[in-house]
Amino acid sequence: MSLSHWLSLISLTFSTFIFNTSEFVPIGLLTDIQTEFHLTKASVGMLISVYAWVVMLLSLPLMIMVSKMEMRRLMLWLLGLFTAFQVMSFLSDSFGMLMLSRIGVACTHSIFWSIISPIAVRIVPEKHRSLALSMVVTGSSVAMILGMPLGRIIGLHVGWRMTFLSIGIFSAFTFCYTALKLPIVPSRGGFSVRKLPALLNQKGIIGTYIFTLLVSTAYYIGYSYIEPFLKQVAHMSDSLVTAALMIFGGAGFLGSLAFSRYYSRNRKAFITWVVALMAVCLLLLTPTSFSTSLLIVVCAVWGMAATAYNVAMQSNIILITTPESTSVAMSIFSGIFNLGIGSGAFFGGQICDHADISYIGYAGAILGFIALLYWIKRLGTRV
């Protein structure tokens, strides 16, 4: 690839980093936000659930509304609005205002994750598309390694509001860099609701969406409450919790590497193995909580498998849909994935409040194995 291709991909990596950091940084700040606003775990967990449900509801309609817009211009609009809503989060003096700002961020998220992968594969030569997708995933991995833990460190030392302001500042920088380095990416034409039946009739797409819902719900039953789990069940210190979250995210690099090396050889087997690993890691959360080292190993494998799964499913959708429907197909994927995030956070919160936080791994594992059986029995021969 040429230098211009690399610089363009870096702009997408930066964007992925800030969007992913913003999406998940509340997970590392839940305890502080809960304490300040005097909320229960289930109530503060709604900060994650509502965000995810907004993305679920708005991904498709918003993407259809902007489907005719040139993608570079659209990306800059998204970054500008994203920055403004981060500042609003910083200024929030009530849980309601914070929730409203997060809903605004969720609206930009709804479109961002629908276009980021299609843009990545369009700005590079065809033979480098897997690398382009891996670069996008790298932004997500760095967010898990540095973004969320660093946001948590900032929150612990100078308050959770400064975490959101820091994201806003980096977002403003990313806006400027993207304006300079991302080339014009023409729209491939508008997409109307009338075309949805044809999209949904494409081979394997409905089953892929059902599978995505099951896996994402299972994953976020556990992951949404990983910070209080590590503190209350594993009795880790604040510094160890931060380290565990960094290792979780860092393992995503291995997941990205595994995807680039093995996914194209056998898509069915690759997805089967990574989902199996995710379910096993959820199952082992509580049994290994007596040992910090064992639990961190489980978190590392879990993070690796989760990243590999995410990029594999995005690649799968690009492969099984037509070029003109890819962005809308990705918007539906994003919406369904976020339905899983919201549902997982909701069910996990109910388990924390009405049973015990130590059970979240078991609940996630049960649903994860159900998803795995669905994949093997219903989708394995069709995807």
Show the residue positions of the predicted features.
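Intracellular juxtamembrane helix-capping segments at the cytosolic ends
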Residues: I111-V124, A308-T322
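Helix-loop-helix hairpin linking two adjacent transmembrane segments in secondary transporters
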Residues: M97, P125-L182, Y225-F229
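Paired small-residue
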Residues: L81-M88, G96-G104, S293-V301
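Helix-breaking motifs and short loop linkers at transmembrane-helix boundaries and internal kinks
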Residues: H38, E70, L91-M97, T108, ...
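Conserved MFS/SLC helix-loop-helix module at the cytosolic interface between two early adjacent transmembrane helices
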Residues: L57-D93
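A late C-terminal transmembrane helix in Major Facilitator Superfamily
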Residues: L319-I357, G364
